[in-house]
Amino acid sequence: MSNLEKLIREKCPNGVKFRKLSECCNILDNKRKPVTKSAREKGEYPYYGANGIQDYVSDYIFDGCFVLVGEDGSVITPSGNPVVNWAEGKIWVNNHAHIIEEIDGVLLRYLYYYIQSVNVRELIHGNIPKLNQGDFKNIRVAVPPLEVQQEIVRVLDNFSFLSAELSAELSAELKARQQQYEYYRNKLLNFNESPESLDTLHTHTHTHTHTDTLVDKK
């Protein structure tokens, strides 16, 4: 039995409650400021748009840890999930990305992974794809106890670290790792899974971990 399964059985005997995203974080969209490219002064601070860093500028409007979710433009992946970025430190965010910060009771890193697992295809509207603020705020989030959130984050952070390492090595292995990561992410964040399914996931994880020891990294 995996540590995660033990935690879920201990902390969530009656299942997991769902809350609106707006109840799980602070949404800071009203503090965003767009700056045209011609008006930007070059500098050291990342300037974020819908799908990540667009430029580096001389000033910042946010300082801390944040999750950014594409609002309009390139805001959806081929699998129907939103475009999500993790941002730390001093940054500038334009009005093409929703920005959220942590509140007590819900880990920001957990939301970072959870939002990536949500299918928002039916929420995207317009000729220019847009995830409007109303739909964004109403995304339903499964909110397990903090101990469960922490364990999910630990597992997914490990996969993210491995993927980052492998990106400098074997592209084929990276693709397999990415598929494995997405599989585990979706399984770990699907609280409708039965305990038997979690048993299978634990066995799956152990098998993959054992196989990894056989990879020759010359």
Q: Predicted segments — roles?
A:
Residues 1-218:
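Charged, alpha-helix-forming regions
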